[in-house]
């Protein structure tokens, strides 16, 4: 989906400097706001959105937008409508349908302009918000889970191949920056050995009832552990807790009951 373009060393150094800086404004989820603001300036756009999405469970575990709330009113109706039409949008569902999270994509990679304007996603979300152009970068976050960085523009020129090439070169550094941010957060939210036992079992796909049997406790106790875990990790769902606690997917290989054995 890319064609050869020239990216200046100065542009690349600037972007790498943005991602590589150790920043103090680390939010409860996502990337530092100052980092996102500088990315928006370097790849000119009207708005930028960075969020984590679980397509299997139809949830987001965080969402950052610059300007804040530009294209998302946060309503349950809007969120439900998004998922109703999500899989019909070739451009939006491409990473989940194909497993390709490396490509930097735009809607016009998949549609003609006329076709794009006739889609439900454009009609229900893009057009009402004044969005004509989008460019998307994805990072893997587990099965059917992606972290997405979206750049938006209104009427005018689409994103260029230079813009796409810059994001392609930036992508591995952004991925490392996001992992580093997750590690920094996890170190500030201490969990007990029992909390880690529960989290490993949740990550393995066990229900509360199965976890209760495995740990020889009641389901009510498991629920209480999860409440405490959510509070310490500053999240509100199982998916978000797993993503926060295991930013590199380490839960898939870590021994579930290691804490008890020690």
Role assignments for model-derived ranges:
Residues 236-249:
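Short, basic, alpha-helical segments at the C-terminal edge of helix-turn-helix-like DNA-binding modules
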């Amino acid at each position: 989906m890319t064609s050869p373009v020239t990216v200046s060393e100065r542009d690349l150094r600037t972007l790498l400097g943005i991602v590589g800086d150790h920043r103090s404004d680390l939010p409860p989820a996502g990337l530092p706001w100052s980092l996102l603001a500088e990315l928006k300036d370097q790849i000119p756009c009207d708005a930028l959105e960075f969020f984590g999405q679980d397509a299997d469970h139809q949830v987001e575990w965080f969402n950052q937008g610059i300007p804040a709330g530009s294209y998302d009113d946060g309503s349950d109706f809007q969120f439900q409508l998004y998922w109703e039409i999500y899989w019909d949008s070739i451009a939006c569902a491409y990473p989940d349908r194909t497993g390709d999270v490396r490509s930097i994509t735009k809607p016009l990679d998949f549609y003609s302009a006329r076709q794009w304007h006739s889609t439900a996603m454009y009609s229900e979300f893009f057009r009402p918000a004044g969005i004509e152009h989008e460019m998307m970068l994805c990072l893997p976050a587990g099965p059917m889970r992606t972290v997405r960085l979206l750049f938006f523009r209104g009427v005018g020129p689409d994103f260029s191949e230079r813009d796409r090439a810059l994001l392609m070169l930036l992508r591995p550094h952004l991925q490392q920056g996001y992992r580093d941010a997750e590690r920094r957060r996890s170190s500030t939210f201490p969990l007990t050995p029992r909390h880690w036992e529960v989290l490993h079992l949740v990550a393995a796909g066990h229900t509360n009832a199965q976890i209760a049997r495995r740990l020889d406790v009641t389901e009510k106790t498991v629920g209480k552990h999860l409440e405490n875990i959510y509070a310490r990790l500053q999240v509100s769902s199982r998916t978000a807790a797993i993503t926060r606690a295991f930013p590199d997917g380490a839960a898939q290989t870590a021994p579930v009951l290691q804490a008890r054995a020690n």
